[in-house]
């Protein structure tokens, strides 16, 4: 009896049809041998490429009986045994989620140990398209996190870079926190940069953190820096929100300088300073050396006091402004009296003059508003005179009214913070101070009241003081000093700097390196200061501290009439989602 052999086409093609993309193997015996070597590996029947290899094997004349025998004998059922073991664990009472995490974590460890980027790249060369299993993988965070780790270790792997792009295309770019991973592809980097900028714009309570995150990514390399700054420069020209982008650009420049990255040539190229070669050369010289010198200051003064001054943006460089503020307000810096007015003029010009396009005239023509220039120069001069004299708290009291009048100018506020920082960070400052609140710190309260935008700087200074080692002081004196600093933080909180202050105190509670009596003191002061309604974020940060028995246990009475109980009852009644 003849056996009729069904030689219909592979995967449903009719007999006699061929795929024009398929070509016959040049050496059938060699192809068969290659396929047999693969079929001999354990559990090859479970491999994604099994159908491709079977097709090659049969087209080259391979024996069906032999391949069936090989695949059967080498079937170890590792995956099936893992599934069976997982089912047993579930039957034994282990939670499904725990079993799943157990299997996934073990599999991740195995992949991390045995991953071969060259073999991974062959996935695309063999299959010619994105495998379905890869598309399914990126839907799950567990496997996306694995891809991120592998991409950091193997930045040149084409398969991983392609997968990162797939992840970004799928909308998960906010998860890509590794800069080296994002910087490999412009599309991915652009999306991650956009997400970072949006976070900066939408998180006014954590501007510093958002800026640091964005700046770290932008400063990853020259290509990321130039690309990002050009993009931000274009956005800064927009009428709506342009100033926010300009601030972001300047903060990125500051971050780069703090990390010893010389970005001055790029900055000068982007600000259009080439039209004013004298001013450009003078500023570049000082920025490159990170120090001011009278000759270059004189060149800038001559340019900006002339009839056709360069754009203000040229000297609104963060590094240059930092150098000017340091020169005029940091104790111990000596400036030649002949050149001092030039320093003051440039600082006042950069902070007080308004440069805007003239109405009904070409965009290239600018209109300068110098109404506040003279008064700003006078305020800087008066404040500089007070700050430049080495005087204690008692002598300073006589100058307070004059100083408070000068502080109304934002640039003077910045300078005064710099001066106070230089004074109070001296190790002997609190040892010599006998006041319950030193005059210098009282001046900080005034700056915080007048300039909300400087509150973050003041908080950073207070945090440094709070965490500073005051070993020369007795323990009780140290506690009183820290209570006084906490009073300054409470003052900041009442002025609107609420979330940053509470986040810091919450961090102190979490680390447990702060005396609990200080946390209790802070909570007491805040409870005496605040009243409802409260924002959900305030309750989320402050309520756990108030509920903490270790902190407020001794502050509670028998009833609900004490401030602690009243706050807790009110929050429980009105903030059920917290």
UniProtKB/Swiss-Prot annotation:
| GO molecular function terms noted in the UniProt entry | RNA binding
Q: Where is this region: Disordered?
A: 1-28
Is Transcription regulation among this UniProt entry's keywords? yes
Q: Which UniProt keywords apply?
A: Chromosome, Nucleus, Repressor, Transcription, Transcription regulation
Q: What is its main location?
A: nucleus
Disulfide feature: none
Keyword Iron-sulfur: yes or no?
no
Instruction: Classify the source by domain of life.
Output: Eukaryota
Its subcellular locations are: Nucleus; Chromosome
A Pfam family matched in the record? TH1
Cellular component terms per the entry's GO annotation = NELF complex; nucleus; polytene chromosome interband; polytene chromosome puff; transcription elongation factor complex; transcription repressor complex
Q: Which GO terms describe its biological process?
A: negative regulation of transcription by RNA polymerase II; negative regulation of transcription elongation by RNA polymerase II
Query: What role does it play?
Result: Essential component of the NELF complex, a complex that negatively regulates the elongation of transcription by RNA polymerase II by RNA polymerase II. The NELF complex, which acts via an association with the DSIF complex, causes transcriptional pausing.
Would you identify the family this protein belongs to, as annotated? Belongs to the NELF-D family.
What quaternary structure, including any partners, is listed in this protein's UniProt entry? Component of the NELF complex, which is at least composed of TH1/NELF-D and NELF-E.
Q: What is this protein called?
A: Negative elongation factor D
Question: Which species does the entry assign this protein to?
Answer: Drosophila melanogaster (Fruit fly)
Q: Which gene encodes it?
A: TH1
